[in-house]
Amino acid sequence: MTTGDCCHLPGSLCDCTGSATFLKSLEESDLGRPQYVTQVTAKDGQLLSTVIKALGTQSDGPICRICHEGGNGERLLSPCDCTGTLGTVHKTCLEKWLSSSNTSYCELCHTEFAVERRPRPVTEWLKDPGPRNEKRTLFCDMVCFLFITPLAAISGWLCLRGAQDHLQFNSRLEAVGLIALTIALFTIYVLWTLVSFRYHCQLYSEWRRTNQKVLLLIPDSKTAPTTHHSLLSSKLLKSASDETTV
C-alpha cells in the first residue's frame, strides 16, 4: 500500500507526517526502516486513532482500513459498499469506530449498519466521567455532600431543640428566629442538592449516549473471504513480476 497526501475523509485513513508530533514518533521508533503514519479522524477533525508502521510489515493481502492489519488475527469483513483498500475492516475496529464517532453508518458510502447499542454501567462513569474538570467537579460535590448532609441534619436538630427550649421559657422571638434559621438552612441544602444532582445527571446522560458498547450485526454473506483475496493478490503480484521480467 502506498501513502499519499492527507485526505481528511471521515472514517478514512489519513496519511499525514508533517506535524512535529509525528516526526518525533517516527524518530523514536525503528529508525532503520521506512515508515508511514496513518490517522482516522471524525467529522469535527478529532483524531480517533493513529497508526505508525514500518513499510516492511504490510500484508500482501487485504488489510483493515482502520488499523492496517491483515486478517491473520481476526477475519476481515466487507460490511458496506466501499471497495478497494477501504472495503475491508475488522469487526472490533469498526465497533470501536462506531462507538467513538457515535454513528451507525459508513462515513464514506453512507451504508447503514445493523448495530446493537448497549449502555455502559454507571460504575464506569464514576471511575472515568470524562474531562478533568468534570472529574474534579464530581469529586468535590460528592465530598461536599458527605460532609454537608450530616452537618445540616445536626444543625437543624440543634436549632429545633433550642427553639423548643425557648418556647418553654416564653421566649417566642428567639424560638421563631431559630425555626426560621432551620427552614432557611434546609432550603439551601435541598436546592444545592437538586442543582448538583441535575447537573451530574445531565453529564451522565450525555456520557451514556456517547459511550455505548456497539455490537455490529453482520450476516455471514458480508464476511470478506480473506483467503480468496490473498490468493487473488498473490496471482496479481506474480503476473506483474512476470510482465516486468519479460
Swiss-Prot record:
Gene name in the database record: marchf2
Domain of life: Eukaryota
Designated name of the protein: E3 ubiquitin-protein ligase MARCHF2
Gene Ontology biological process: endocytosis; protein ubiquitination
PROSITE patterns: ZF_RING_CH
Pathway(s): Protein modification; protein ubiquitination
Location within or outside the cell: Endoplasmic reticulum membrane; Lysosome membrane; Endosome membrane
Pfam family of the protein (one): RINGv
